[in-house]
Structure formats: C-alpha cells, structure tokens
Amino acid sequence: IAGDVIDEHQLGSIEYAASHLGAPLIVVMGHTHCGAVHTAINHDPEGYIKFITDKIKAAIGDECDPYKAACLNVKSCEAEIEASLEIQKVEHQEGLRVIGAMYHLENGLVDFI
C-alpha cells in the first residue's frame, strides 16, 4: 500500500492473519526514498492521492527530513495496528508482536525501529 497507510480493509486483513491464521509477527515496513512521504512533505496533491498524503502528514507533523518522516510514518502505522482491540487480545493471549522496520533501497539492509 502506498505510504504504509492503513484503512479498515488492511486492518481487517491484519486482524484475520493474527487471530485466525496465527501469524506470530506483524512487520510494518517502510522504505527509504518513499515517493508518498516525499509528496506529503513537498506537495499538496489533488485527487485520491490526497487521502494518502493527508494521513502521512498527520503522522509526520512538521518533520521535513525524508528518512525521519518515513520512520515516523511507520511508527504511526504500528501504533494504529496496536490500537486494535483484536490485535491487543492476540498480543496478550498468543504473544503476537507488531514491529516497525525500514528497508534501505540503496543497499538492501533493513533496520528495525
């Protein structure tokens, strides 16, 4: 999903994977040089892209550094998933973990944040 934005459909799929399929780990992975984050920082797009960038802007606030902004966006998505009562239940009962990560396009490395 562009910009790691989460809506009810994605959250429902994540809840299903955790509660019905037994997924032990949910990783929210952003990446460096993210076009959606760049657009949220530098532009005010029109059309449906605005729904994506508005959600990113809410997550990153006034942060203008693209890497830091992408990390803030990942952490926001992580928090949104963890706010789900279904996810909280599986975390408590089954030990589910939700973590954030950043993939570096330039070298293929992943940082867990």
Residue ranges and their predicted role:
Residues 28:
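Conserved functional hotspot residues or short segments at active or partner-binding sites
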Residues 31:
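Histidine-centered divalent metal-coordination motifs
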Residues 3-23, 36-113:
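Divalent-metal-activated hydrolytic enzyme cores
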